[in-house]
């Protein structure tokens, strides 16, 4: 600020032309969403896009505290919008009420009402629909509404995060209910969010989807039904460039104005770009609740043996990878719980790089040194499995190759086969078609109970229409019990030992191999202000009305 003031005094006093009007902002990201439906599949590209176009009831803000976005007041026991009660079968339950924000409308001018949330609740309760967050809908056993702006859910248990509506968001009942009622199981492929994406009646945020070029870009325009603060740009283009080198080239050529850190350049690439470009762009490095890891398919007999999983982790020098590729800016992970999370256990087991111990575990598991340096079991089978990640992400592919070499040094063959993100997430992972390991990231929120990724009921199956994100197929009765008990304990001090035990199980059993907690690199033009990275699963796009042109 001082440097700016000095420069102004030293310069001749002349009339300055107004800054050029900027009607369009072009944003580069590295994935294209496989669907735009708010409740189907879990993908960062979709969540980032929906931040501009679909207003949730609640979200965690940049300060990691819960906020009302589509509601007017957060429910609490103190204000009476949350009430303890007894369920019809005699269990402790909770009645929670949200009131919709006044003036909330869909893009065609139709008010958002309780009926839109009733439809979302009914579709979520019909598990053949395949919505994510199945436990939320199972627990919410009754929907009540006294008026068009009032929504009450009765839950069959008490939970500490009751004020958060999570992914329980309005869906335009007049448009989507007929499609759903015609074919509940086939609804995910018939929804207007993917077949008529430009219908303004689907969108309730500051922007609406105006056009989609599948696999390439999504055009957003100001939503005429939006009654909140006006966003700065008439039009936003979200451009998907899966190859990060190509994305950087488009940024330098001015074909994109900014790269969203939520899904943008890897840290090492951004650091190198900042060194080369000086002050041309603004860079912000935001540490957050983003967990890079390798999911392992535990139905694979090789990976079903916990000794093999432990050996794989011992055989990776994660500290060296972080230091050489990321300048030490990303903390090595012990579990999926970030060290800054209030429930992180500093005493959780850690697996240092120890190739000798890794080889001893493989010997113990029956894998002996074999021809070509790859271990074999008594039946002569090679210790070999497929290793996947998102094609085009240069940093992930580089990490993958480094890990492949480290594993080969202990006698393990990892066969690399990568896929574009929209295929990997929409089909291979969500339908558990991967057979070995898959390197990707999960994004969470503060004190997020990992039900969808670790509870045995969340293993995706055809019968569940592939809902759930327990891609490894992890089954552990104690883990299930902890995940069910944790949300019901309102006292943080009493939750702490439950969290510690949950972390101990994941660190010992290793359904996924923890790598590091990621810092995201946000790259903005100098003329853009107001973007506030959050570091968690409610992305900066939710606060687009705060973005301004300097």
Describe the residue ranges of each PLM region:
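Gly/Pro-rich hinge or "lid" segments in bacterial periplasmic/extracellular proteins
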Residues: 59-65, 169-231, 235, 245, ...
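Surface-exposed binding/hinge segments that line
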Residues: 134-186
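Extracellular/periplasmic solute-recognition and catalytic clefts
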Residues: 124, 142-144, 210-224, 237-300, ...
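Detector for C-terminal structural segments
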Residues: 17, 29, 213-217, 222-224, ...
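Short helices/loops that flank or line small-molecule/ion binding pockets
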Residues: 109-111, 116, 245-256, 272, ...
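Aromatic- and charge-enriched surface segment that lines or borders ligand/interaction sites
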Residues: 74-130, 152, 247-250, 302-304
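N-terminal lobe/hinge region of extracytoplasmic solute-binding protein
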Residues: 28-88, 200-204
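Alpha-helical secondary-structure segments
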Residues: 26-29, 113-120, 150-154, 205-206, ...
């Amino acid at each position: 600020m001082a440097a700016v003031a000095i420069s102004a005094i030293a310069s001749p006093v002349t009339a300055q032309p107004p800054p050029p009007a900027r009607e369009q902002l072009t944003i580069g990201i590295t994935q294209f969403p496989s669907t735009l439906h708010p409740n189907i599949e879990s993908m960062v590209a979709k969540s980032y896009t929906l931040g501009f176009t679909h207003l949730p009831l609640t979200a965690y803000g940049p300060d990691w505290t819960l906020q009302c976005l589509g509601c007017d007041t957060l429910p609490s026991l103190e204000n009476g919008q949350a009430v303890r009660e007894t369920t019809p079968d005699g269990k402790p339950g909770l009645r929670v009420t949200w009131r919709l924000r006044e003036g909330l409308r869909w893009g065609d001018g139709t008010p958002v009402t309780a009926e839109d949330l009733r439809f979302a609740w009914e579709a979520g309760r019909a598990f053949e629909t395949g919505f994510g967050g199945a436990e939320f809908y199972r627990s919410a056993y009754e929907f009540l509404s006294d008026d068009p702006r009032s929504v009450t859910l009765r839950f069959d248990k008490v939970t500490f995060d009751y004020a958060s509506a999570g992914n329980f968001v309005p869906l335009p009942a007049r448009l989507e209910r007929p499609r759903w009622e015609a074919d509940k199981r086939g609804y995910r492929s018939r929804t207007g969010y993917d077949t008529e994406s430009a219908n303004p009646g689907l969108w309730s945020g500051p922007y609406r989807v105006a056009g989609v070029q599948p696999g390439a870009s999504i055009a957003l325009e100001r939503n005429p039904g939006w009654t909140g603060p006006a966003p700065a740009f008439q039009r936003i283009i979200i451009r998907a460039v899966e190859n990060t080198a190509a994305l950087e080239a488009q940024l330098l050529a001015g074909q994109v104005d900014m790269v969203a850190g939520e899904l943008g350049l890897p840290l090492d690439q951004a650091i190198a770009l900042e060194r080369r470009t000086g002050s041309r762009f603004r860079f912000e490095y935001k540490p957050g609740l983003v967990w890079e890891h390798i999911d392992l398919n535990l139905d694979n007999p090789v990976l079903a043996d916990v000794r093999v999983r432990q050996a794989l982790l011992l055989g990776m020098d994660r500290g060296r990878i972080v230091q050489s590729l990321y300048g030490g800016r990303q903390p090595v992970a012990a579990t999926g719980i970030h060290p800054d999370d209030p429930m992180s256990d500093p005493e959780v087991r850690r697996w240092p790089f120890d190739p000798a111990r890794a080889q001893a575990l493989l010997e113990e598991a029956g894998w002996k040194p074999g021809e070509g340096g790859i271990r074999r079991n008594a039946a002569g089978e090679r210790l070999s499995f497929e290793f996947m990640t998102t094609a085009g992400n240069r940093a992930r592919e580089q990490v993958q190759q480094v890990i492949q070499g480290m594993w080969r040094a202990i006698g393990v063959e990892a066969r690399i086969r990568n896929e574009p993100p929209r295929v990997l997430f929409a089909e291979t992972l969500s339908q558990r078609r991967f057979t070995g390991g898959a390197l990707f990231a999960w994004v969470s929120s503060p004190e997020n109970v990992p039900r969808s990724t670790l509870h045995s009921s969340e293993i995706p199956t055809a019968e569940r229409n592939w809902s759930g994100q327990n891609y490894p197929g992890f089954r552990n009765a104690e883990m299930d019990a902890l995940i069910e008990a944790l949300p019901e304990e309102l006292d943080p001090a009493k939750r702490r030992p439950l969290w510690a035990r949950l972390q101990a199980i994941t660190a010992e059993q290793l359904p996924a191999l923890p790598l590091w907690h990621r810092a995201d690199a946000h790259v903005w033009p100098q003329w853009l202000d107001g973007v506030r990275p959050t570091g968690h699963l409610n992305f900066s796009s939710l606060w687009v009305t705060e973005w301004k042109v300097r």
